Swiss-Prot record:
UniProt keyword annotations, A-Z: Coiled coil, Cytoplasm, Cytoskeleton, Isopeptide bond, Phosphoprotein, Ubl conjugation
Feature: compositional bias, Low complexity: 460-473, 562-576
Biased segments, Basic and acidic residues type: 130-151, 405-435, 523-539, 594-735
Name of protein: MAP7 domain-containing protein 1
Annotated localization: Cytoplasm, Cytoskeleton, Spindle; Cytoplasm, Cytoskeleton; Cytoplasm, Cytoskeleton, Microtubule organizing center, Centrosome; Midbody
Family: Belongs to the MAP7 family.
Sequence ranges of Polar residues compositional bias: 365-377
UniProt entry tagged with the keyword Phosphoprotein: yes
Amino acid sequence: MESGPRAELGAGAPPAVVARTPPEPRPSPEGDPSPPPPPMSALVPDTPPDTPPAMKNATSSKQLPLEPESPSGQVGPRPAPPQEESPSSEAKSRGPTPPAMGPRDARPPRRSSQPSPTAVPASDSPPTKQEVKKAGERHKLAKERREERAKYLAAKKAVWLEKEEKAKALREKQLQERRRRLEEQRLKAEQRRAALEERQRQKLEKNKERYEAAIQRSVKKTWAEIRQQRWSWAGALHHSSPGHKTSGSRCSVSAVNLPKHVDSIINKRLSKSSATLWNSPSRNRSLQLSAWESSIVDRLMTPTLSFLARSRSAVTLPRNGRDQGRGCDPGRGPTWGRAGASLARGPQPDRTHPSAAVPVCPRSASASPLTPCSVTRSVHRCAPAGERGERRKPNAGGSPAPVRRRPEASPVQKKEKKDKERENEKEKSALARERSLKKRQSLPASPRARLSASTASELSPKSKARPSSPSTSWHRPASPCPSPGPGHTLPPKPPSPRGTTASPKGRVRRKEEAKESPSAAGPEDKSQSKRRASNEKESAAPASPAPSPAPSPTPAPPQKEQPPAETPTDAAVLTSPPAPAPPVTPSKPMAGTTDREEATRLLAEKRRQAREQREREEQERRLQAERDKRMREEQLAREAEARAEREAEARRREEQEAREKAQAEQEEQERLQKQKEEAEARSREEAERQRLEREKHFQQQEQERQERRKRLEEIMKRTRKSEVSETKQKQDSKEANANGSSPEPVKAVEARSPGLQKEAVQKEEPIPQEPQWSLPSKELPASLVNGLQPLPAHQENGFSTNGPSGDKSLSRTPETLLPFAEAEAFLKKAVVQSPQVTEVL
């Protein structure tokens, strides 16, 4: 290809004039014997005209190996040789080519349809058309690749966005699932807590009901036992035998009429009896009492007036109580368990065993811990054998009393009996000292006391001579018995006047028993009973003032009516185990009285005792009602207080639960809010990271495009330099040919650019010597076309689809140069400014 231009340069025509004139489009290629040089816009057809500047990188170095396929035989990086045809002929020869055809498919029709120029050699025209077509194909392929790349990036971005949406939806779903699980856990925990509280409440209610029922049972049982134990002391006096009736009549003194000097003994005995009652087995069953129940029991344990009256009567009449207590069985101590049995069955002796035929003492029958059994030995050991035989005879003869067997004592009861016996021994010693002191004080006895003592001594041999009747065989004899010594006998002690005067109830019962007694006693018993009744009346006559001073607060005189000779013997009897005495009281009651005054006196005494009994019972009932009322009020107050405390506790518990629940909900909300904020922060960080990744990716792509663009610019610069030199040589040869053959092109060039023609005329000789400014003059239109694009009609790389418009825009360049004075100065300026334009690109 280079051989043609070099041959044309050797033709010898002057080419300097035509080298600087741009070619003018001709109307038709047929009429021109010599076609003009191609326009400058067709020199570098790199990229398609409709590509934006940012997408120039598509024409990378990958497309450059396509250029050696052209049959032009060019060697080097030149993309396209100069075109020989005019733009109009090129447009005609191009025709309606499809945009999607490849470069290999488009070559044969372009070779066949392209007319060969007449003046240009045949080796130049086919490579030019092929290069143009290849450039168009490359542009189209580059455009397609850019579109595919854009589609790929859009699809990738859509995939990224879709993945991000999926991840966001998954995070939301996980958060909702976590919230749901937490809510379910909270509900389950609340249900479990509510069920646990309900079970605890039911358990507390059940325990409370059971505890209240146990307390009620314990209180009722304790109160019933205490009432039974306390009132049984008085009840035993009314339900027992006539001997007990007499002792009950003695004990019916009110508390106001008791003497003052007995208070210390009563207080001692009361404290001991309270301790005994408190430590009893019935108390041990209800030890688990609260404070207020203990206070109630303590209040109930305080002595009443009747209790003090009985205690004072026991102290006032110690001789009778001690004599009666001597017949107490060792197995029948003052135990609470056998008190009710002795009250219900009455004191019946055991007839089967010879040593068991012992009457029960009245104090042990009444289950009173205050009056102990003085002696544990039975009456058989102190009485003579004859008396024992006489006593057993009427019982064996025809006694209607049933046989009573004593139950076996358990080890616990034996231990209790031993403890009570020790306490009784202590009380006996204290009472013995007190009585001995009183006996010393009452040594000068009154003649009435001596008289009663003499009558008692007279009655004692009679009572010894006769056996006891079946009705009186259950009671203890009241008179002293002789000492167990063989030859030594104690002087008999007289009974007290109150002991001789029996109560009206006792007399009535004696009459009934006398009627019911068997008639086998005989006339001897009747005569003896009559004599005994007359003696009793005689002894009761001097002792009649004894009941009258009973209401007075002065002490009763029975203790003082004892002879002084009895003091040492009585002390000896008390220190040693005393023996029972034969009975002094009449064993058979009299049928009635014939004295009107005696009957009136007995009736008045009976009425007085009944009135006192009613008053005592009424007072005790009032006190009991007050105690019950006070107890009920206290119980109601305690229940109200406990209920208020429970309600306050329930309110406090509910408030505490509400606070805990609110705190738990607040903590849960804070935790959920914190989790939400953390999730949002993580999502923001993820989005920021993805955005930075995309930006980095886009920057990398942009950098790659810039690098490709720079490489392309460098290639374009090298290509332009080589093309400018070749084009200048071709134009010189063409101008020389044109000047030699036809002058019309020269005229046209002169008409269009007179300033440039003048410059070419002035400097036609040193063309090869001035390549410094001639090369930029050729490069100026190309730089304007390929660089800045001053006109909107031009496309990016100077390749236009409509050739005439591009030629017209190039034809304006000499008109813009007209206002300057000299074209040389403008060209010099253009030479200076053109490198700056290239640097900006």
